[in-house]
Protein backbone atom coordinates (compact mmCIF):
# COMPACT_ATOMS: atom_id res chain seq x y z
CA UNK A 1 0.00 0.00 0.00
CA UNK A 2 2.81 2.42 0.86
CA UNK A 3 4.43 1.76 -2.52
CA UNK A 4 1.20 2.79 -4.24
CA UNK A 5 0.99 5.95 -2.14
CA UNK A 6 4.57 6.83 -3.13
CA UNK A 7 3.81 6.21 -6.81
CA UNK A 8 0.60 8.26 -6.84
CA UNK A 9 2.11 11.71 -7.36
CA UNK A 10 4.46 10.86 -10.25
CA UNK A 11 1.83 8.74 -12.02
CA UNK A 12 -0.93 11.35 -11.63
CA UNK A 13 1.48 14.12 -12.68
CA UNK A 14 2.32 12.24 -15.86
CA UNK A 15 -1.13 10.97 -16.87
CA UNK A 16 -3.55 13.25 -15.00
CA UNK A 17 -5.72 12.46 -12.02
CA UNK A 18 -8.80 11.40 -13.97
CA UNK A 19 -6.87 9.06 -16.27
CA UNK A 20 -4.95 7.61 -13.33
CA UNK A 21 -8.18 7.06 -11.38
CA UNK A 22 -9.81 5.28 -14.32
CA UNK A 23 -6.74 3.15 -15.15
CA UNK A 24 -6.19 2.12 -11.52
CA UNK A 25 -9.85 1.13 -11.12
CA UNK A 26 -9.81 -0.88 -14.34
CA UNK A 27 -6.67 -2.68 -13.12
CA UNK A 28 -8.33 -3.26 -9.73
CA UNK A 29 -11.41 -4.75 -11.39
CA UNK A 30 -9.34 -7.04 -13.63
CA UNK A 31 -7.20 -8.28 -10.71
CA UNK A 32 -10.31 -8.76 -8.57
CA UNK A 33 -12.05 -10.86 -11.22
CA UNK A 34 -8.89 -12.92 -11.76
CA UNK A 35 -8.73 -13.50 -8.00
CA UNK A 36 -11.97 -15.52 -8.20
CA UNK A 37 -10.40 -18.01 -10.61
CA UNK A 38 -7.26 -18.70 -8.58
CA UNK A 39 -7.50 -22.30 -7.36
CA UNK A 40 -7.59 -23.04 -3.65
CA UNK A 41 -4.30 -24.91 -3.46
CA UNK A 42 -0.73 -24.41 -2.27
CA UNK A 43 0.22 -22.74 -5.56
CA UNK A 44 -3.04 -20.83 -5.50
CA UNK A 45 -2.14 -19.45 -2.08
CA UNK A 46 0.96 -17.76 -3.51
CA UNK A 47 -1.02 -16.45 -6.49
CA UNK A 48 -3.67 -15.07 -4.11
CA UNK A 49 -0.96 -13.42 -2.04
CA UNK A 50 0.59 -11.86 -5.15
CA UNK A 51 -2.82 -10.66 -6.38
CA UNK A 52 -3.57 -9.10 -3.00
CA UNK A 53 -0.18 -7.35 -2.92
CA UNK A 54 -0.87 -5.85 -6.35
CA UNK A 55 -4.41 -4.88 -5.32
CA UNK A 56 -3.03 -3.28 -2.17
CA UNK A 57 -0.49 -1.27 -4.17
CA UNK A 58 -3.21 -0.02 -6.52
CA UNK A 59 -5.42 0.85 -3.57
CA UNK A 60 -2.48 2.83 -2.22
CA UNK A 61 -2.54 4.94 -5.37
CA UNK A 62 -6.25 5.62 -4.88
CA UNK A 63 -6.10 7.06 -1.36
CA UNK A 64 -4.08 10.24 -2.00
CA UNK A 65 -5.51 10.54 -5.50
CA UNK A 66 -9.10 10.77 -4.27
CA UNK A 67 -8.20 13.34 -1.61
CA UNK A 68 -6.39 15.49 -4.17
CA UNK A 69 -9.47 15.29 -6.40
CA UNK A 70 -11.55 16.58 -3.47
CA UNK A 71 -9.17 19.55 -3.30
CA UNK A 72 -9.72 20.15 -7.02
CA UNK A 73 -13.49 20.11 -6.47
CA UNK A 74 -13.01 22.64 -3.68
CA UNK A 75 -11.00 24.95 -5.96
CA UNK A 76 -13.59 24.54 -8.72
CA UNK A 77 -16.41 25.45 -6.32
CA UNK A 78 -14.50 28.47 -5.01
CA UNK A 79 -13.80 29.71 -8.53
CA UNK A 80 -17.36 29.15 -9.73
CA UNK A 81 -19.33 30.37 -6.70
CA UNK A 82 -16.80 32.94 -5.42
CA UNK A 83 -16.84 31.47 -1.93
CA UNK A 84 -14.55 28.95 -0.24
CA UNK A 85 -16.29 25.71 0.66
CA UNK A 86 -13.25 23.57 1.43
CA UNK A 87 -14.50 22.56 4.88
CA UNK A 88 -17.90 21.53 3.54
CA UNK A 89 -16.41 19.51 0.68
CA UNK A 90 -13.85 17.67 2.81
CA UNK A 91 -16.22 17.02 5.72
CA UNK A 92 -18.99 15.73 3.44
CA UNK A 93 -16.44 13.53 1.64
CA UNK A 94 -15.27 12.16 4.98
CA UNK A 95 -18.86 11.54 6.06
CA UNK A 96 -19.62 9.77 2.76
CA UNK A 97 -16.59 7.51 3.29
CA UNK A 98 -17.75 6.68 6.81
CA UNK A 99 -21.25 5.86 5.55
CA UNK A 100 -19.73 3.79 2.75
CA UNK A 101 -17.61 1.83 5.22
CA UNK A 102 -20.58 1.22 7.49
CA UNK A 103 -22.94 0.22 4.69
CA UNK A 104 -20.28 -1.86 2.90
CA UNK A 105 -19.29 -3.70 6.07
CA UNK A 106 -22.91 -4.37 6.95
CA UNK A 107 -23.73 -5.52 3.43
CA UNK A 108 -20.86 -8.03 3.53
CA UNK A 109 -22.18 -9.48 6.79
CA UNK A 110 -25.76 -9.56 5.47
CA UNK A 111 -24.59 -11.40 2.35
CA UNK A 112 -22.64 -13.92 4.42
CA UNK A 113 -25.66 -14.52 6.65
CA UNK A 114 -27.92 -14.92 3.61
CA UNK A 115 -25.47 -17.44 2.15
CA UNK A 116 -25.48 -19.60 5.27
CA UNK A 117 -22.19 -18.59 6.89
CA UNK A 118 -21.86 -20.36 10.24
CA UNK A 119 -20.35 -18.51 13.19
CA UNK A 120 -20.33 -18.85 16.94
CA UNK A 121 -19.07 -15.58 18.41
CA UNK A 122 -19.27 -16.92 21.99
CA UNK A 123 -16.67 -19.65 21.54
CA UNK A 124 -14.83 -18.47 18.43
CA UNK A 125 -14.97 -22.09 17.34
CA UNK A 126 -14.20 -22.80 13.67
CA UNK A 127 -16.85 -24.48 11.53
CA UNK A 128 -16.81 -26.14 8.16
CA UNK A 129 -18.63 -23.66 5.98
CA UNK A 130 -21.26 -24.65 3.41
CA UNK A 131 -20.34 -24.24 -0.26
CA UNK A 132 -22.73 -21.28 -0.55
CA UNK A 133 -20.83 -19.40 2.18
CA UNK A 134 -17.47 -20.20 0.58
CA UNK A 135 -18.73 -18.96 -2.79
CA UNK A 136 -20.00 -15.78 -1.11
CA UNK A 137 -16.58 -15.22 0.50
CA UNK A 138 -14.88 -15.61 -2.87
CA UNK A 139 -17.34 -13.17 -4.48
CA UNK A 140 -16.74 -10.67 -1.66
CA UNK A 141 -13.04 -10.80 -2.59
CA UNK A 142 -13.52 -10.70 -6.37
CA UNK A 143 -16.67 -9.86 -8.30
CA UNK A 144 -18.16 -7.41 -5.80
CA UNK A 145 -15.03 -5.21 -5.53
CA UNK A 146 -14.67 -5.44 -9.32
CA UNK A 147 -18.24 -4.19 -9.76
CA UNK A 148 -17.59 -1.28 -7.38
CA UNK A 149 -14.45 -0.37 -9.34
CA UNK A 150 -16.37 -0.43 -12.63
CA UNK A 151 -19.07 1.82 -11.14
CA UNK A 152 -16.32 4.22 -10.02
CA UNK A 153 -14.92 4.25 -13.57
CA UNK A 154 -18.35 5.05 -15.01
CA UNK A 155 -18.94 7.87 -12.51
CA UNK A 156 -15.49 9.45 -12.91
CA UNK A 157 -15.68 9.22 -16.71
CA UNK A 158 -17.89 12.32 -16.58
CA UNK A 159 -15.58 14.13 -14.08
CA UNK A 160 -14.84 17.44 -15.82
CA UNK A 161 -11.75 18.53 -13.86
CA UNK A 162 -8.89 17.55 -16.16
CA UNK A 163 -5.32 18.76 -15.73
CA UNK A 164 -5.89 21.52 -18.31
CA UNK A 165 -9.16 22.61 -16.68
CA UNK A 166 -7.49 22.75 -13.24
CA UNK A 167 -4.65 24.90 -14.62
CA UNK A 168 -7.32 27.30 -15.91
CA UNK A 169 -9.15 27.31 -12.57
CA UNK A 170 -5.91 27.82 -10.61
CA UNK A 171 -5.00 30.83 -12.77
CA UNK A 172 -8.49 32.33 -12.33
CA UNK A 173 -8.39 31.67 -8.58
CA UNK A 174 -5.05 33.43 -8.26
CA UNK A 175 -6.54 36.57 -9.86
CA UNK A 176 -9.77 36.22 -7.88
CA UNK A 177 -7.89 35.93 -4.57
CA UNK A 178 -5.72 38.94 -5.36
CA UNK A 179 -8.85 41.04 -5.96
CA UNK A 180 -10.46 39.98 -2.67
Residue ranges and their predicted role:
Residues 1-180:
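Membrane-embedded alpha-helical bundles of multi-pass transporters/translocases
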Amino acid sequence: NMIGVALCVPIAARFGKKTTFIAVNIALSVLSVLFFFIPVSQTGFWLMLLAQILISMLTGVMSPLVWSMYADVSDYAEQKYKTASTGLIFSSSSMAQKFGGAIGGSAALWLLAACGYISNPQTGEAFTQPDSALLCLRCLMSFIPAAVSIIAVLVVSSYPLTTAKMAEIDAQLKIQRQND
